[in-house]
């Protein structure tokens, strides 16, 4: 509830710390400020409608959302290929389905795909090829390559939305991270049916930002926190108790 919000974050800060940038600890951000991040949403028109529907509506529930994603693989992948092929620059292309990865690999001539069925050696070889610039475009899934990799040579990311803000955050941060010298563009490709997925992803992003901001605020003022109700008076009880 609203009246307990501040005490809650004060309690969290008694056992947790949050740091996003040097200024969160009172230092200067000058040498840490990242280039601008440009996030673009591209709404793709589906070529077919769900059974029994006269026009496109946002999918309701996970079942309908999965069906929407599988039904629009061709249209969404074509949009990503158009965005990536038009630049001639390195691009990091994220997908979630095997069908998406295979379609993208066919549509982007100079791309390499890292899939779950690849051997560890093959994965390493292809990831290194992209990192070293021998492959212009890398296609993979967040659960495979969204953690622990540095691709600062690339400043173009495409993403199919999901309900996981963590996946989106980590996927973007492979390129938009310390050491990146150019503005980073993220093209989010979706359909009318996935409006609900996008809204949920945006809500989680806003909540995550609010959480970090509040944690940093309370963390920095923690030294001034005092207990408001400190019951130090001994209770008076009858002598016969």
Model-derived regions, located:
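Interdomain linker/hinge connecting the two RecA-like lobes of the SF2 helicase core
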Residues: 1-91, 95-107, 204-228, 237-240
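Hydrophobic residues at beta-strand termini and immediately following loops
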Residues: 42-45, 113-116, 189
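Short, solvent-exposed loop/turn segments at secondary-structure junctions
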Residues: 47-49, 97-101, 119, 144-145, ...
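Alpha-helical elements of the RecA-like P-loop NTPase motor core of helicases
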Residues: 78, 102, 124, 149, ...
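Conserved helicase ATPase core of P-loop NTP-dependent helicases/translocases
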Residues: 92-94, 101-105, 109-145
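Short, well-ordered beta-strand core segments
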Residues: 138, 156-158, 175
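A short beta-strand element within the Helicase C-terminal
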Residues: 149-162, 184-188
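A conserved SF2-helicase RecA2
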Residues: 163-241
